[in-house]
From Swiss-Prot:
Enzyme class: isomerase
Active site: 102
Organism: Escherichia coli O7:K1 (strain IAI39 / ExPEC)
Names of required cofactors: Mg(2+)
Presence of the UniProt keyword Transmembrane in the record: no
Membrane-spanning residues: none
Function according to Swiss-Prot or TrEMBL: Catalyzes the conversion of glucosamine-6-phosphate to glucosamine-1-phosphate.
GO molecular function, one term: phosphoglucosamine mutase activity
Record protein name field: Phosphoglucosamine mutase
UniProt PTM comment: Activated by phosphorylation.
Pfam families reported for this sequence: PGM_PMM_I, PGM_PMM_II, PGM_PMM_III, PGM_PMM_IV
Entry EC no(s): 5.4.2.10
UniProt keyword Flavoprotein present: no
Reactions listed under catalytic activity: alpha-D-glucosamine 1-phosphate = D-glucosamine 6-phosphate
């Protein structure tokens, strides 16, 4: 990626009220995006948001900027990120814009774009928008100003799309499901999808008030879901994050089922049904148990850098259709164009219904390896600890001891002066000792 001033790997994000997430910046961003996208001939942009209180302010600013550039805004209201990608495709809009900071707290927000085909904007278009941001705002003639309107049936359209990814011959009528919508964008979507497919649904995290998104609920904190699954004696629980592009599940015993396990279930079911094309893409953080379980099934596996953008790039490079991060981003290119928590969850439920198996039993073919992560802070003026001979020597010793049944990953944080030390292997006590041994070597530099 080139050096950019505003766009990161997942759009523009920050604390509301601090640059760049301010009304004046977002208005100019809307104008700049409008100027660039108008060159492609379309005059409409889909705008969706999650449930953060700042979404109202930011969508108004975006709409004003787009209108000044001559483009019309179609508002969806609170809507999952993948729903905006879907609606952008079906409306043939020039682009879709999502106002969300995903799994972050309510006081953060962000802006990300989808192109006409429901994928992330190409780098060249993002760069053109940044170049336009350096110019003074100008307004089109009054007769050419953009308008604003609402897509009144946006939720219903997306609910039907999600249901269409679940096999017609199957039903969820045997299942009692607790669904946790993180007080986020799936609150009025996911429970209805599951109920309409026949499930007995208990909904939590479905009372957004603008400031409670991701607050001790959702895919990043499943404790409330685990407790409710056990209390209700439910068959399973499903948690989404604030914008609905991640899913984490909980089995009937209260065990967390992460993105690695979800991908394993979906890939194995695809193999059984003769529908799996190629292999599966994980990340550097994917559990070694996933790699070994897929290998046992004869399914090729490749690792991408951490980030759903890089997972998708690796999938496209290899021509494969399934990819996931252990955090719960699951990308199924046969079904949709981006990570979609509801669609991924439905594929696991289809495997349960088709095989008459519990979520717990579907996971049993994959043994999760203990994965110990230690963060070590360092000072930038002491040089790169990863290049130090003592750190390299200790790392080599640990790798030799683990052999082919474990691995070591050392990487720098992209946002703080931290070295992340990850050691994975079959024996938890051993890998814990190894992780701290390497961390001590990093600290000593």
């Amino acid at each position: 990626m080139s050096n950019r001033k505003y766009f990161g790997t997942d759009g523009i994000r920050g604390r509301v009220g601090d640059a760049p997430i301010t009304p004046d910046f977002v208005l100019k961003l809307g104008w700049a995006a409008g100027k660039v996208l108008a060159r492609h001939g379309s005059r409409k942009i889909i705008i969706g948001k999650d449930t953060r209180i700042s979404g109202y302010m930011l969508e108004s600013a975006l709409e004003a900027g787009l209108a000044a550039a001559g483009l019309s805004a179609l508002f969806t209201g609170p809507m999952p990120t993948p729903a905006v990608a879907y609606l952008t495709r079906t409306f043939r809009a020039e682009a879709g814009i999502v106002i969300s900071a995903s799994h972050n707290p309510f006081y953060d927000n962000g802006i990300k774009f989808f192109s006409i085909d429901g994928t992330k904007l190409p780098d060249a278009v993002e760069e053109a928008i940044e170049a336009e941001m350096e110019k003074e705002i100008s307004c089109v003639d009054s007769a050419e100003l953009g308008k604003a309107s609402r897509i009144v049936d946006a939720a219903g359209r997306y609910i039907e799309f999600c249901k269409a990814t679940f096999p017609n011959e199957l039903s969820l009528s045997e299942l009692k499901i607790v669904v946790d919508c993180a007080n986020g964008a799936t609150y009025h979507i996911a429970p209805n999808v599951l109920r309409e497919l026949g499930a007995n649904v208990i909904a939590i995290g479905c009372e957004p008030n603008g400031v409670n998104i991701n607050a001790e609920v959702g895919a990043t904190d499943v404790r409330a879901l685990q407790a409710r699954v056990l209390a209700e004696k439910a068959d399973l629980g499903i948690a989404f994050d604030g914008d609905g592009d991640r899913v984490i599940m909980v089995d009937h015993e209260g065990n967390k089922v992460d993105g690695d396990q979800i991908m394993y279930i979906i890939a194995r079911e695809g193999l059984r049904q003769g529908q799996l094309r190629g292999g599966a893409v994980g990340t550097l953080m994917s559990n070694m148990g996933l790699e070994l379980a897929l290998k046992q099934l004869g399914i090729p596996f490749a690792r991408a850098k951490v980030g759903d953008r890089y997972v998708l790039e690796k999938m496209q490079e290899k021509g494969w259709r399934i990819g996931a991060e252990n955090s719960g981003h699951v990308i199924l290119l046969d079904k949709t164009t981006t990570g979609d928590g509801i669609v991924a969850g439905l594929q696991v439920l289809a495997a349960m219904a088709r095989n008459h198996m519990s979520l717990h039993d579907l996971c049993s073919g994959m043994k999760m390896f203990p994965q110990i992560l230690v963060n070590v802070r360092y000072t930038a003026d002491s040089g790169d600890p990863l290049e130090h001979e003592s750190v390299k020597a200790v790392t080599a010793e640990v790798e030799a001891a683990l052999g082919s049944r474990g691995r070591v990953l050392l990487r720098k944080s992209g946002t703080e002066p931290l070295i992340r030390v990850m050691v994975e292997g079959e024996d938890e006590a051993q890998v814990t000792e190894f992780a701290h041994r390497i961390a001590d070597a990093v600290k000593a530099v």
